[in-house]
């Protein structure tokens, strides 16, 4: 009884051991109750049938008795679950043997997987079956024979070759677990197979009143917790976490990655227990690497798109602990491409002077930690305290980045290789991306806190500890290192980060020269989307820097590429514009959302639009005044966005006071165009968004000065035709500028041939040249002539379309036979038709004929 109870086990791999024992116990009780009930019912039915057999039923008695006798002859064989599983095991082994005969490795590979899954179920209730040991031993011999036959291996097709390689890789790992059984089998095959199977000792199960009602007596050597309770694994076996079993547990966890119904939280608890019993540095490093990967797997399979805060902080602490172990034990190196240790029974021994290479990637872990923090910031409301708390975790992440950089520097110094150099470049790039957009004061605090948190003996050769206070030198050092040792996208991104940093710190000319010398403007379309976003951010920052420096033309010219499109949010990755009839697929939209920048990296779009419109106003208003007074000049538009907003505002019947930043700039432009520069300056300075810029008083003073200068230019363009001469002192009093400044502005206008005048320095006056500028009447005449020419050209095009280019379209006096139209003699003698009186053959009915209008009359005359 106990054997069947213990061996019933779990028929599905996904059910837990606790539920197996519970359900088995319940099923036995239910089966006993049901059997007793069925016996009672059958006895009652038999008695009722015997009493009720009357009439026709008496004549059917012989037939029923014969059927009962036939049923008694049939013997029903009841097999236990263990026997059924052994039969399934034998069937799989038979298929493998048949496939070996025809050399079908695809079938062998698939059946070998089934065999291993089936043997797990069988071994839950007993020892390893001898037929399984025989099968895997013979299969290993068959693999070795196939390897020796090189020619036959070359003749395999693709599916056969894949199956053979899969079996060859798995058979050695699999047979290590059954090495003792296989040795016994190979030493005496017949004697081994004739021996009897050992019975498994049943576990003693005691009922409990909890959901899991069982207590398994653990061995005395096992470490018990919770008042005598111990962790029990599959088949009721007590799980023992010892230093010798660490690699086996890790192997099971690694092989279960990617499979369904895998409890990763339980795996994490297991690895935390393994950390407690780990003794050697190799064991701790292996556990930390697997533990970090498992924590990151939780976020990839969860419904949330980012890692939870608790899991992230635990992963960050474990990464710091892993780095501490690696810094202490320099003979253990975690590197990509290292060979994996296959023997789980024993651990590798490091001889003095040698280095043990462990497969893994420290850089990938710190990059994943960085990405998870970014995803978390993307999904948190930036206007809450939670965002600020989450942003404070960046300090720990930056500390780990610097620590990983110092560790990889040591590896590169010990052994230079392209792979290690690439890893170092990736870490340096990540570090640069965390500081390039921050002001110097913030970076200084971050650097000082980082070096205080790191061990005192730890230092970096690329960025020494002593240079932490020089932020400009730090950015320059990181960028120069990437310029020297990297290429492609990393070098381009480093260049853009340096340009952004220089522009942020008001070094316009250096940032502009670097942008021009890099030639990134010509090649940016060849880079990935994230680099293009960084390019747009850098371009905008250069424009803002030019505006702060008072370089209005350069600012407007730089910002027009991004702000003129009306898609600032998309181009700067600060939001998604959802269009009604967009053809964007859900996958593209998901990628677009992943590329969005966290809120603390955003550039203020309202401030950006205000600066762009203000710069456009300073250029457009004088240009509009110049073209209105000089219509012979070709009309050109500097900013279509500004013109469109200004035209819309002028079409309004009633305009109220300015309600937002955009309205404030447009109202200021209207005052400036009307010549009232004081109201324009007052309106522009009243915009509150200037307070968000550094040194707002200096910015407002610069804006007032620009309005005075552009107001002077607008006044001269508008009223120059009405003056013979104009005193400079009068202009100085009117615009509150120094006479020297006014003379400089007028000289510049004269040199650029914007103003037909001369500067009389003796009398301090401007002398305008007559005959060059057109009067109002002359301007109107020129405008009328242009419109007449346009009308004439339009009529000529219409004429050619109607007559299809025939020269004799309006020669009516030459008679009916000479009519043009759609062909010679239409409706006349050419087609044999009757000649109509009055030369009216070929005319279309209805009486509506094209006469050419005024142009037709002119041609007929």
UniProtKB/Swiss-Prot annotation:
Biased composition (Gly residues): 817-861
Biased composition (Acidic residues): 14-53
Any one annotated GO CC term: eukaryotic translation initiation factor 3 complex, eIF3e
Subcellular location: Cytoplasm
SUPFAM superfamilies reported in the protein's UniProt record: Winged helix' DNA-binding domain (SSF46785)
One Pfam family named in its UniProt record: PCI
Renumbered residue ranges of the record's region Disordered: 1-76, 812-861
Claim: Cytoplasm is one of the keywords in the record: yes
GO annotation, biological process: formation of cytoplasmic translation initiation complex
Keyword list, A-Z: Cytoplasm, Initiation factor, Protein biosynthesis
GO molecular function: RNA binding; translation initiation factor activity; translation initiation factor binding
Entry's family note: Belongs to the eIF-3 subunit C family.
UniProt name for this protein: Eukaryotic translation initiation factor 3 subunit C
């Amino acid at each position: 009884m106990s054997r069947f109870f213990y061996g019933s086990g779990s028929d599905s791999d996904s059910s837990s051991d606790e539920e197996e024992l519970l359900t088995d116990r319940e099923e036995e009780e239910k089966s006993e109750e049901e059997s007793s009930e069925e016996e009672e019912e059958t006895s009652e039915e038999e008695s009722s049938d015997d009493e009720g057999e009357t009439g026709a039923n008496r004549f059917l008695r012989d037939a029923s008795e014969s059927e009962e006798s036939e049923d008694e002859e049939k013997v029903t064989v009841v097999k236990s679950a263990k026997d059924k599983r052994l039969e399934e095991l034998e069937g799989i082994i038979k298929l493998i043997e048949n496939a070996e005969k025809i050399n079908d490795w695809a079938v062998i590979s698939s059946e070998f997987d089934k065999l291993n899954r089936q043997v797990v179920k069988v071994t839950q209730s007993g020892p390893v079956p001898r037929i399984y040991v025989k099968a895997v031993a013979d299969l290993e011999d068959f693999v070795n024979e196939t390897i020796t036959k090189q020619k036959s291996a070359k003749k395999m097709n693709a599916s056969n070759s894949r199956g053979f390689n899969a079996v060859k890789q798995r058979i050695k790992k699999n047979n290590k677990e059954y090495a003792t059984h296989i040795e016994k089998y190979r030493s005496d095959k017949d004697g081994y197979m004739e021996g009897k199977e050992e019975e498994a000792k049943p576990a003693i199960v005691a009922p409990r009143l909890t959901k899991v009602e069982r207590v398994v007596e653990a061995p005395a050597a096992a470490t018990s917790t919770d008042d005598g309770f111990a962790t029990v694994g599959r088949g009721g076996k007590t799980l023992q976490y010892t230093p010798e079993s660490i690699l086996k547990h890790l192997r099971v966890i690694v092989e279960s990655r990617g499979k369904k119904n895998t409890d990763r939280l339980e795996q994490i608890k297991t690895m935390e227990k393994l950390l407690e019993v780990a003794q050697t540095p190799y064991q701790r490093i292996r556990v930390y690497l697997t533990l970090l990967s498992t924590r990151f797997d939780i976020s990839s399979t969860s419904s949330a798109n980012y890692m939870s805060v608790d899991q992230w902080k635990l992963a960050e602490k474990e990464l710091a602990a892993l780095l501490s172990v690696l810094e202490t034990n320099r003979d253990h190196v975690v590197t990509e491409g290292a060979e994996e240790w296959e023997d789980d029974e024993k651990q590798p021994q490091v001889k003095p002077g040698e280095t043990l290479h462990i497969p893994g990637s420290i850089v990938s872990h710190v990059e994943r930690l960085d990405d998870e923090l970014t995803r978390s910031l993307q999904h948190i409301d930036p206007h809450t305290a939670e965002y600020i708390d989450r942003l404070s975790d960046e300090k720990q992440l930056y500390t780990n980045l610097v620590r990983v950089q110092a560790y990889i520097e040591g590896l590169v110094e010990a052994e230079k290789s392209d792979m290690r150099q690439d890893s170092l470049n990736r870490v340096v790039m990540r570090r640069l991306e965390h500081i390039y957009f921050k002001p110097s004061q913030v970076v200084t605090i971050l650097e000082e806190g980082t070096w205080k948190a790191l061990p005192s003996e730890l230092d970096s050769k690329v960025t020494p500890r002593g240079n932490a206070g020089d932020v400009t030198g730090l950015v320059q050092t990181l960028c120069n290192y990437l310029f020297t040792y990297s290429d492609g996208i990393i070098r381009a991104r480093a260049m853009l980060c340096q340009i952004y940093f220089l522009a942020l710190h008001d070094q316009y000319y250096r940032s502009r020269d670097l942008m021009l010398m890099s030639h990134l403007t010509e090649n940016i379309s060849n880079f990935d989307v994230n680099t293009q976003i960084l390019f747009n951010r850098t371009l905008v920052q250069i424009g803002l820097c030019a505006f702060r420096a008072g370089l209005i033309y350069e600012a407007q010219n730089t910002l027009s590429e991004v702000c003129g499109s009306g898609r600032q949010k998309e181009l700067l990755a600060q939001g998604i514009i959802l269009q009604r009839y967009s053809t964007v697929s859900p996958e593209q939209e998901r990628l677009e959302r992943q590329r969005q920048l966290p809120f603390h990296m955003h550039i203020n779009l309202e401030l950006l639009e205000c600066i762009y419109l203000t710069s456009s106003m300073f250029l457009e208003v004088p240009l509009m005044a110049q073209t209105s007074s000089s219509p012979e000049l070709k009309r050109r538009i500097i900013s279509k966005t500004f013109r469109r907003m200004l035209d819309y505002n002028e079409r309004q019947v009633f305009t109220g006071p300015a309600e937002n930043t955009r309205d404030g700039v447009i109202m200021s432009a209207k005052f400036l165009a009307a010549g009232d520069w004081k109201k324009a300056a007052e309106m522009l300075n009243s915009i509150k968004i200037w307070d968000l810029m550094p040194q707002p008083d200096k910015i407002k003073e610069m804006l007032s000065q620009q309005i005075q200068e552009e107001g002077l230019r607008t006044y001269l363009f508008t009223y120059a035709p009405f003056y013979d001469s104009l005193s400079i002192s009068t202009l100085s009093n009117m615009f509150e500028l120094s006479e020297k400044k006014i003379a400089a502005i007028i000289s510049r206008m004269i040199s650029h041939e914007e103003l037909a005048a001369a500067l009389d320095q003796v009398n301090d006056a401007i002398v305008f040249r007559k005959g060059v500028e057109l009067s109002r009447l002359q301007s109107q005449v020129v405008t009328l002539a242009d419109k007449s020419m346009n009308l004439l050209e339009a009529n000529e095009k219409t004429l050619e379309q109607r007559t299809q280019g025939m020269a004799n379209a309006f020669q009516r006096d030459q008679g009916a036979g000479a009519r043009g139209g759609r062909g010679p003699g239409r409706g006349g003698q050419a087609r044999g038709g009757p000649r109509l009186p009055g030369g009216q053959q070929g005319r279309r009915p209805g009486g509506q004929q094209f006469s050419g209008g005024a142009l037709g009359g002119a041609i007929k005359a």
